[in-house]
């Protein structure tokens, strides 16, 4: 080894001597003719093993410089020969020889190291949408499968593309933001074994793809001189390299600002730039702009500063300051005013008396920078003595201001005196405002309607001696000697408000002979005609006051502004596929009866299959029904056929419209209405929703064996079936066995009796509320408004499945205390939303209010809402003022929260039925939810997904059942 090295040294010296000897005789080489140096060994790559010698010689006649590059490191050597006696893996890299002309040659050296296959620079940064290099060059080029792998065996993203280079590393193409914090290894196979480098954590610098988001703490500021002005601008972007600054428009002055910044996550950067002027002056007023920019673009936002030398108050009357109002009417005096600083004292004054109530003052806007306020004085049922000057005063720390309203009360004339004077004059004195006019009339006899005018001989006008702005007194006289016959003189005083009359009856000595025949006949005719008119009017009034039968359910066709447009049910098509032969119906007992019709239990033969019979409910009209009632029942049939089937509504099964009175065939619900069911179950209610109380429930049911079941006669809507022996199943087993949605008749008597003997628990109540919400959500998806949702209108069938119905035809609302007479309608006031009571507005949101009342009924086990409170003016007033019922005894806190949201005074803040379903789903047990889902999947018709009505409705109004509001001004 030493001999070879010595020979090599000798050869190098010899070559140098030859160059020195020949160099002086050769001409100099120009840069244009220069050539790059020659490296020995003459290879582009050199592979050595760790510990071997690296000897590189740069052959060039002039000065040379060696540079060694690996990763981001560079070493230099100004010798022509680069010698590394014991090579290490870190000596792997590119060796470049450069001559004095700047020309260079290079060789890449690999130093194989069995323990170090990769040279690693663990810092790994990449810019979004650009390429980045994973610096893991190889020390041995003779490996395979040089690639990237995820840490801990995780796969790399499918869209990650890379290009390997043994000398530089692996280039990741088109870096994405999703690669941020991606853990990677460089991987290669050597001699059949996979080798991994140290791990890299890729940090991605996001690219700007949008302008910064800029906002300010307030859009405008109003300050007095000397106060501090502070405004904060918030800049949001993906990176801290975003630029921002405060500028004042039309001012080159540099503004002093402070910064505070932080990162919220990897690509959410937020900066706050706060501008402060410690003591403002009037000339500081102007527009300040917060400007931010990145490589994508710029954005800005402005705030306005107004500086005043002192505070101010400006008052703006919203009505004329001179007000005329009729006696007994109401008037509101309204002002708007601007006040800065905030007002400290406000008051209304009348005749040196300060009002302590009847007025309200509030800011016009909830905006923090609002300086505009509203003050209203409410004067109710003004008397004639309450005219005068009403003054509004307001003040703040700097200034005070006021405005006066002059109120005149218009009063109907009042005749103060009417006398016969000693000189034969008749005098009439009247008072009123505006000034009354007095006219005189004469008629012969004792008539009370005189028509012949008489001119007065003396008229005097004087102001009243009462309080200011009071009545004006007018005096008028006539000479009675001008009248030659017995008669009546009328003094009529009138103005714009009304009129009043007084009469003078007098007789002269001569008597006028009355007609002996004509007058009695005329009087008799008038009396008879008057009585007949009165009788006709009474009969007409009673007929018009009689509640008319109509379909409660309304289907919305479209919404125009603030009005619903309903589909006229009479115009809906009727599909004769629903026709069922009358002779296949066998009628039984009456389930319910009302003023217009009744519901009868019946057996239908061959309704589904020719060899089956099933129990159904049939709606029909009474023989005394009018044409309007017949049309209403047909409309109800068309609405039911339009809605289609759903598990939680009483579904249409068929109809008979040909060859006789209209019959509507619907599902039969064995337990009757939910209200009576809850009341029957009060004594056996278990305050738990865990089904592991089944044995306790059965034991309790044995103690209450006399409790009514589906065969009891106490409920008007029950199936009469003979009792059978059976074993009582658990409630969950009973529900699983129910085949809801199938119309095929089967013997359900044992199941019905079993279900009714089961106790009632909290899980049942939650299930009922959940099912009714599902049914109402279905109706809302069909644009249908119920308008009478209550426990009495919910039926219960086997499996404790609830079904929503409309009892309008078969309920005796005349004798039902839940329905209050208003106009020509009887309405369930305690279940109605405020907008329905006061404005006749029926919407999806008013149904949500009624649902909240239904929940209160449900969790009070059938109690009447607002217990002990009659429907009177006090009730209406409490509803207006936001009175709501307390939580019923058995309601969980979550359910009472739902009730309160249903009773929100703002209809838009009430939840939709779809949202209510989602809220209750969180309360019911998994088994109940699973059972209900299974029952829904067994439904014979595929139910369409429920559409949230809040997507379509803006809580607009409609005139519906009654043509007049339920509450007028005199009611409260």
UniProtKB/Swiss-Prot annotation:
Positions glycosylated per UniProt: 130, 145, 283, 300, 320, 352, 367, 463, 486
| Disulphide bridges, residue numbers | 58-97, 136-186, 151-183, 233-290, 428-491
Residues assigned to the Extracellular compartment are 26-520
Localization annotation: Cell membrane
User: Which domain of life does the protein's organism represent?
Assistant: Eukaryota
All residue ranges annotated as the Ig-like C2-type domain in the record = 27-112, 121-205, 212-308, 317-410, 413-507
Q: Where is the signal peptide?
A: 1-25
- List every position bearing Phosphoserine: 737, 742, 817, 887, 955
Which catalytic residues are annotated? 788 (proton acceptor)
What are the TM regions of this chain, as residue ranges?
521-541
Q: Which UniProt keywords apply?
A: ATP-binding, Cell membrane, Disulfide bond, Glycoprotein, Immunoglobulin domain, Kinase, Magnesium, Membrane, Metal-binding, Nucleotide-binding, Phosphoprotein, Proto-oncogene, Receptor, Repeat, Signal, Transferase, Transmembrane, Transmembrane helix, Tyrosine-protein kinase, Ubl conjugation
| Molecular function GO labels | ATP binding; cytokine binding; growth factor binding; metal ion binding; transmembrane receptor protein tyrosine kinase activity
Q: Which residues carry this modification: Phosphotyrosine?
A: 543, 549, 564, 566, 699, 717, 726, 819, 896, 932
Annotated positions for site Important for interaction with phosphotyrosine-binding proteins = 932
Name the Gene Ontology biological process terms: actin cytoskeleton organization; cell chemotaxis; cytokine-mediated signaling pathway; detection of mechanical stimulus involved in sensory perception of sound; digestive tract development; embryonic hemopoiesis; erythrocyte differentiation; erythropoietin-mediated signaling pathway
Ranges facing Cytoplasmic side:
542-972
Summarize what the UniProt record says about post-translational modification: Ubiquitinated by SOCS6. KIT is rapidly ubiquitinated after autophosphorylation induced by KITLG/SCF binding, leading to internalization and degradation. Autophosphorylated on tyrosine residues. KITLG/SCF binding promotes autophosphorylation. Phosphorylated tyrosine residues are important for interaction with specific binding partners.
The entry summarizes how activity is regulated as: Present in an inactive conformation in the absence of bound ligand. KITLG/SCF binding leads to dimerization and activation by autophosphorylation on tyrosine residues. Activity is down-regulated by PRKCA-mediated phosphorylation on serine residues.
| EC id | 2.7.10.1
List positions binding Mg(2+): 564, 793, 806
**How does this protein assemble?**
Monomer in the absence of bound KITLG/SCF. Homodimer in the presence of bound KITLG/SCF, forming a heterotetramer with two KITLG/SCF molecules. Interacts (via phosphorylated tyrosine residues) with the adapter proteins GRB2 and GRB7 (via SH2 domain), and SH2B2/APS. Interacts (via C-terminus) with MPDZ (via the tenth PDZ domain). Interacts (via phosphorylated tyrosine residues) with PIK3R1 and PIK3CD. Interacts (via phosphorylated tyrosine) with CRK (isoform Crk-II), FYN, SHC1 and MATK/CHK (via SH2 domain). Interacts with LYN and FES/FPS.
Q: What is this protein called?
A: Mast/stem cell growth factor receptor Kit
User: From which source organism is this entry?
Assistant: Callithrix jacchus
């Amino acid at each position: 080894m030493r001999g070879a090295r010595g020979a090599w040294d000798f050869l190098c010296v010899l070559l140098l001597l030859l160059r020195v000897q020949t160099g002086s005789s050769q001409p100099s080489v120009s840069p244009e003719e220069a050539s790059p140096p020659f490296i020995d060994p003459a290879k582009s790559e050199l592979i050595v093993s760790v510990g071997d010698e690296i000897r590189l010689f740069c052959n060039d006649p002039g000065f040379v410089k060696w540079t060694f590059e690996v990763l981001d490191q560079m070493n230099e050597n100004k010798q022509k020969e680069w010698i590394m006696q014991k090579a290490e893996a870190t000596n792997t890299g590119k060796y470049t020889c450069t001559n004095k002309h700047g020309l260079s040659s290079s060789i890449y050296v690999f130093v194989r190291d069995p323990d170090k296959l990769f040279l690693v620079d663990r810092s790994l940064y990449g810019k979004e949408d650009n390429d980045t290099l994973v610096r893991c060059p190889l020390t041995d080029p003779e490996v395979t499968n040089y690639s990237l792998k995820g840490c801990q065996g995780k796969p790399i993203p499918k869209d990650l593309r890379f290009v390997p280079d043994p000398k530089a590393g692996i280039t990741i193409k088109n870096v994405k933001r999703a690669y941020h914090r991606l853990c990677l290894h460089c991987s290669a196979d050597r001699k059949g074994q996979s080798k991994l480098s140290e791990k890299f954590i890729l940090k991605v610098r996001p690219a700007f793809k949008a302008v910064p988001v800029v906002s300010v703490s307030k859009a405008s500021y109003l300050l007095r001189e000397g106060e501090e002005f502070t405004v904060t601008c918030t800049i949001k972007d993906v990176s801290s390299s975003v630029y921002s600054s405060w500028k004042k428009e039309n001012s080159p002055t540099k503004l002093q600002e402070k910064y505070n910044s932080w990162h919220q996550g990897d690509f959410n950067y937020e900066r706050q730039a706060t501008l402060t002027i410690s003591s403002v002056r009037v000339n500081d007023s102007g527009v300040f702009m917060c400007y931010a920019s990145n490589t994508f673009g710029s954005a800005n936002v402005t705030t306005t500063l107004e500086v005043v030398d002192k505070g101010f108050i400006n008052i703006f009357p919203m009505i004329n300051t001179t007000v005329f109002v009729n006696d007994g009417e109401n008037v509101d005096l309204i002002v708007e005013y601007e006040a800065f600083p905030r007002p400290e004292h406000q008051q209304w004054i009348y005749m040196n008396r300060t009002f302590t109530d009847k007025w309200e003052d509030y800011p016009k806007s909830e905006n923090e920078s609002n300086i505009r306020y509203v003050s209203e004085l409410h004067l109710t049922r003004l008397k004639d003595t309450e005219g005068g000057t009403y003054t509004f005063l307001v003040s703040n720390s700097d200034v005070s201001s006021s405005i006066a309203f002059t109120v005149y009360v218009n009063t109907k004339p009042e005749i103060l005196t009417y006398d016969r004077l000693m000189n034969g004059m008749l005098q009439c004195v009247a008072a009123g405002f505006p000034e009354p006019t007095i006219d005189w009339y004469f008629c012969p006899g004792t008539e009370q309607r005189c028509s012949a005018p008489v001119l007065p001989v003396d008229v005097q006008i004087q102001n009243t001696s009462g309080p200011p702005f009071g009545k004006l007194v007018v005096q008028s006289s006539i000479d009675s000697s001008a009248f030659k016959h017995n008669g009546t003189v009328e003094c009529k005083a009138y103005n714009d408000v009304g009129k009043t009359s007084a009469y003078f009856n007098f007789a002269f000595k001569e008597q006028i002979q009355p007609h002996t025949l004509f007058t009695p006949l005329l009087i008799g005719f008038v009396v008879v005609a008057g009585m007949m008119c009165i009788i006709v009017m009474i009969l007409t009034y009673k007929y018009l006051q009689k509640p008319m039968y109509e379909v409660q359910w309304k289907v919305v066709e479209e919404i125009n502004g603030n009005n619903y447009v309903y589909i006229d049910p009479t115009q809906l098509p009727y599909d004769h596929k629903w026709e069922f032969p009358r002779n296949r119906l066998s009628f039984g007992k009456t389930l319910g009866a009302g003023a217009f019709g009744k519901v009868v239990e019946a057996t239908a033969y061959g309704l589904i299959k020719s060899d089956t019979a099933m129990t159904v409910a049939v709606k029909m009209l009474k023989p005394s029904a009018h044409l309007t009632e017949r049309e209403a029942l047909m409309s109800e049939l068309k609405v039911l056929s339009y809605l289609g089937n759903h598990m939680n509504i009483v579904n249409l099964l068929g109809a008979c419209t040909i060859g006789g009175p209209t019959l509507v065939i619907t599902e039969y619900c064995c337990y009757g209405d939910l209200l009576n069911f809850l009341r029957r179950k009060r004594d056996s209610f278990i305050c738990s929703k865990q089904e592991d109380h089944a044995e306790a429930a059965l034991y309790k049911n044995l103690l209450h064996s006399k409790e009514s079941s589906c065969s009891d006669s106490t409920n008007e809507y029950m199936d009469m079936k003979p009792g059978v022996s059976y074993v009582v199943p658990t409630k969950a087993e009973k529900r699983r066995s129910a085949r809801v949605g199938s119309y095929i008749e089967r013997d359900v008597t044992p199941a019905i009796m079993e279900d009714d003997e089961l106790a009632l628990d909290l899980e049942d109540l939650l299930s009922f509320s959940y099912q009714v919400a599902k049914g109402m959500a279905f109706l809302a998806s069909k644009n249908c408004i119920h308008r009478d949702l209550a426990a009495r209108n919910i039926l219960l069938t086997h499996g404790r499945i609830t079904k929503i119905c409309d009892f309008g035809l078969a309920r005796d609302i005349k004798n039902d205390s839940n329905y209050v007479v208003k106009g020509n309608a009887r309405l369930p006031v305690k279940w109605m939303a405020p907008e329905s009571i006061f404005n006749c507005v029926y919407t999806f949101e008013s149904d949500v209010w009624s649902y909240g009342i239904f929940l209160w009924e449900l969790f009070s086990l059938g109690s009447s809402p607002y217990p002990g409170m009659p429907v009177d003016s006090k009730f209406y007033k409490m509803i207006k003022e936001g009175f709501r019922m307390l939580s019923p005894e058995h309601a969980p806190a979550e359910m009472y929260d739902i009730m309160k949201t249903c009773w929100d005074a703002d209809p838009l803040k009430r939840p939709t039925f779809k949202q209510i379903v989602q809220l209750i789903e969180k309360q019911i047990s998994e088994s109940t939810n699973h059972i209900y889902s299974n029952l829904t999947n067994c439904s014979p018709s595929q139910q369409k997904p429920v559409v949230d009505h809040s997507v379509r409705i803006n809580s607009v109004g409609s005139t519906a059942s009654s043509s007049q509001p339920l509450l007028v001004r005199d009611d409260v």
